[in-house]
C-alpha cells in the first residue's frame, strides 16, 4: 500500500516509522495526488484520527498516525473572537473540549485554558492548536486538506502564503466561486473539488484549473454514480476520494468496517478518508482474497 506514497514524494523514516512525506515543491504535490493505472491508495485521516484515545484535530493525533503509516489529513480551520485561526471542527466547544459555548465568542487566550476531549468524552492533556502551529508541524511530514468553516477565503490564502505552505496544503472547494478565488490568488494551488454529479465538474474546468492540480471528493459511499464519476476523473488523470467517516466508519465491528473499506478500494477509488486511518490503512493493505 505504501509504495505509491513513497514513490511520489521524498521520505524520512526510521525502520519502523515515522512515515513522513516531504514535498519539495508544488510539482511534487501534484505528482503525489495524480492518478496513474495501478496506483496504490492514499489514506486520509479525517480530522487526524479518533484512535488511541486521542482527540480529533490535535497535533498528537496527526503524529500518531504517521508513526504507523504514511497518510495525509483533512483538518478544520475556524476563527476565534480575536481572529486567530485555530484547528477545530465544531462551532461550539462542548463536544470536544471541557469548555462550553461558541468558539467565535472566545479569544485565543481563553481557548488556551481548555483541554481537548477524545471520542469517549474523556478530557486529555492535549490543547487546541492554531492553524499556524499545524502548518509548522506538518512541513516535511504530510499534506493537509483544509475544509471550509467560518474563516474568510482571503485569510486562508494569506496564512498559506505566510507559511510558504503551498507545496503541502490542499484547498477544499464546494463551489466554482470559491475555486475561482483561490486559483486567481495562487495559480499553483492544489485543489480538492467536492461534487456529486458528473456535470458539476465542467464549471471547474472552465476556470482553467489544470487537471493535475485537482483531486475529486465524490461522496461518502460507493454507488453506480460514484463509479461513473470516478471513471470520468480517471480519464483526466484525477484521483477520486470517498469519505468513510459518516458511513462505513459507523459499522459495528472491525471486520465489517474492513470489508467495507476494501470494497471502496476494489471499486477503483484511490483516496479513502476515515476517522480511523490506521485501522483502515491496515485493512486495505491486508486485502483478503
Predicted segments with their positions:
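Bacterial N-terminal signal peptides
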Residues: 1-5
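Phosphate-group recognition and catalysis centered on beta-loop-alpha active-site segments
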Residues: 8-289
Amino acid at each position: 500500500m505504501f509504495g505509491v506514497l513513497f514513490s511520489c514524494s521524498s521520505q524520512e523514516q526510521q525502520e519502523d516509522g515515522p512515515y513522513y512525506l516531504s514535498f519539495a515543491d508544488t510539482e511534487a504535490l501534484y505528482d503525489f495526488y495524480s492518478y496513474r493505472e495501478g496506483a496504490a491508495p492514499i489514506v486520509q485521516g479525517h480530522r487526524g484520527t479518533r484512535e488511541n484515545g486521542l482527540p480529533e484535530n490535535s497535533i498528537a493525533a496527526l503524529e500518531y498516525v504517521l508513526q504507523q503509516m504514511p497518510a495525509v489529513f483533512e483538518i478544520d480551520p475556524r476563527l476565534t473572537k480575536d481572529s486567530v485561526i485555530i484547528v477545530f471542527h465544531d462551532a461550539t466547544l462542548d463536544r470536544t473540549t471541557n469548555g462550553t459555548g461558541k468558539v467565535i465568542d472566545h479569544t485565543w487566550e481563553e481557548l488556551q485554558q481548555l483541554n481537548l476531549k477524545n471520542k469517549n468524552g474523556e478530557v486529555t492533556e492535549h490543547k487546541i492548536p492554531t492553524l499556524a502551529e499545524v502548518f509548522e508541524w506538518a512541513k516535511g511530514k504530510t499534506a493537509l486538506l483544509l475544509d471550509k468553516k467560518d474563516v474568510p477565503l482571503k485569510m486562508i490564502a494569506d496564512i498559506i502564503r505566510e507559511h510558504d505552505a503551498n507545496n503541502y496544503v490542499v484547498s477544499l472547494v464546494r463551489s466554482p466561486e470559491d475555486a475561482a478565488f483561490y486559483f486567481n490568488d495562487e495559480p499553483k494551488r492544489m485543489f480538492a473539488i467536492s461534487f456529486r454529479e458528473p456535470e458539476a465538474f465542467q464549471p471547474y474546468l472552465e476556470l482553467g484549473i489544470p487537471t493535475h492540480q485537482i483531486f475529486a471528493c465524490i461522496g461518502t459511499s460507493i454507488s453506480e454514480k460514484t463509479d461513473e464519476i470516478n471513471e470520468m476523473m480517471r480519464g483526466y488523470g484525477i484521483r477520486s476520494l470517498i469519505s468513510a467517516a459518516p458511513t462505513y466508519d459507523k459499522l459495528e465491528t472491525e471486520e465489517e468496517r474492513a470489508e467495507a473499506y476494501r470494497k471502496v478500494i476494489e471499486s477503483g477509488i484511490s483516496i479513502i478518508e476515515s476517522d480511523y486511518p490506521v485501522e483502515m490503512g491496515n485493512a486495505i493493505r491486508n486485502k483478503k482474497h
